[in-house]
Amino acid sequence: MGDWSFLGRLLENAQEHSTVIGKVWLTVLFIFRILVLGAAAEDVWGDEQSDFTCNTQQPGCENVCYDRAFPISHIRFWALQIIFVSTPTLIYLGHVLHIVRMEEKKKEREEEEQLKRESPSPKEPPQDNPSSRDDRGRVRMAGALLRTYVFNIIFKTLFEVGFIAGQYFLYGFELKPLYRCDRWPCPNTVDCFISRPTEKTIFIIFMLAVACASLLLNMLEIYHLGWKKLKQGVTSRLGPDASEAPLGTADPPPLPPSSRPPAVAIGFPPYYAHTAAPLGQARAVGYPGAPPPAADFKLLALTEARGKGQSAKLYNGHHHLLMTEQNWANQAAERQPPALKAYPAASTPAAPSPVGSSSPPLAHEAEAGAAPLLLDGSGSSLEGSALAGTPEEEEQAVTTAAQMHQPPLPLGDPGRASKASRASSGRARPEDLAI
């Protein structure tokens, strides 16, 4: 057959821009197909028509039987197989050469532009396109070039499968020495004989094995490219995170918890109660933030009562008891002789009260533990609104106070006593404090 050197040179150029499996495939194509076909197969099939004989004298019967036995010669069939299988690789090579030529033109334009400049920089090397060249100077297989290479492999695989199937349906994988032919113009079924059938069968099996090996290499290359691209895709997604966080580095320390402002406990304002000041002294009312007065005040902590109703009831009773004691103290002050009234009001002793009447208020105060409030002689509206009880409870508290504090027998005018009693129920009048 013809010279295969031109095709070999083209495929050799394509081998430089192929993968490892692609280079192996081209090696198999060169050695086990082109060389075997050109060196041995032509000699084996060179005399196949001249040595094909039939037991008939009918003119044309032998040629018709040969055409039916071998629709296409094995040599020409394998030559077509090599050409068809190599065509996708040649197309890929044309794409590579196109890219190389475009790069050369680009370099030439850059050199021309550099020469046209007023101050050229000869030391500046021409910059290559990083997307088309790798670190070894070869054309990078990416983008459109990669798609061309993948289509190259797919079409090679399809051609291999097609030619293997065609060989099976045309010849089968074995040549028999005897071939029976009944085709016209043969008068009857004639026997035809094939020369060197065993040798030809060996070559058929060998070429079939080479075709299967090429098909397997194509499938491996598809798997290799698919796995490589899948790995690159995963690496491109996870690569930046892995590069920023090298191995062996500890996790960053957790952020400190957000500092919250300290909880401000809002309590009730303190209340100051007078400790039984004498009648002549003015009563001072405490309020939050005010400086303490000169009189003796006692700061009582605000505690929660066990029962609201019980504490209010007991405190109402205690309040009325204190009012009753103050009334008796006013009466005693009025009965004092003029010599004793000349003394300061601060030296006036505490109001006399029976022994039995002083202990119950203290006992009630310790037992109830009610919230202390500011006590004055007149009873403020705050006390009345916060600790006001039902009329029955107030009546019971007043009755208890009357039972515990029996008034002494009047020594003077009973009218004055009733008059002082009416005056003590309200605010102190100026005539009560007159000396």
Swiss-Prot record:
Region (Disordered), start-end ranges: 108-136, 332-435
Effect upon mutating R76 to E/K: Abolishes formation of gap junctions. No significant effect on formation of functional hemichannels
Residues that span the membrane, as ranges: 20-40, 72-92, 153-173, 202-222
Bilayer topology annotation: Multi-pass membrane protein
Stated consequence of mutating L11S: In CTRCT14; autosomal dominant congenital/infantile 'ant-egg' cataract
Record localization: Cell membrane; Cell junction, Gap junction
Gene3D superfamilies, A to Z: Gap junction channel protein cysteine-rich domain (1.20.1440.80)
Topology, Cytoplasmic side: 16-19, 93-152, 223-435
GO molecular function: gap junction channel activity; gap junction hemi-channel activity
GO biological process: cell-cell signaling; gap junction-mediated intercellular transport; visual perception
Biased composition, class Low complexity, residue ranges: 342-389, 415-427
PROSITE patterns: CONNEXINS_1, CONNEXINS_2
Keywords: Cataract, Cell junction, Cell membrane, Disease variant, Disulfide bond, Gap junction, Membrane, Transmembrane, Transmembrane helix
Pfam short name (any one): Connexin
UniProt topological domain (Extracellular) ranges: 41-71, 174-201
Function of the protein: Structural component of lens fiber gap junctions. Gap junctions are dodecameric channels that connect the cytoplasm of adjoining cells. They are formed by the docking of two hexameric hemichannels, one from each cell membrane. Small molecules and ions diffuse from one cell to a neighboring cell via the central pore.
Medical condition linked: Cataract 14, multiple types: An opacification of the crystalline lens of the eye that frequently results in visual impairment or blindness. Opacities vary in morphology, are often confined to a portion of the lens, and may be static or progressive. CTRCT14 includes zonular pulverulent cataract, among others. Zonular or lamellar cataracts are opacities, broad or narrow, usually consisting of powdery white dots affecting only certain layers or zones between the cortex and nucleus of an otherwise clear lens.
Subunit structure as annotated in this protein's UniProt entry: A hemichannel or connexon is composed of a hexamer of connexins. A functional gap junction is formed by the apposition of two hemichannels. Forms heteromeric channels with GJA8.
Family, similarity comment: Belongs to the connexin family. Alpha-type (group II) subfamily.
Identification of the protein by name: Gap junction alpha-3 protein
Gene that encodes it: GJA3
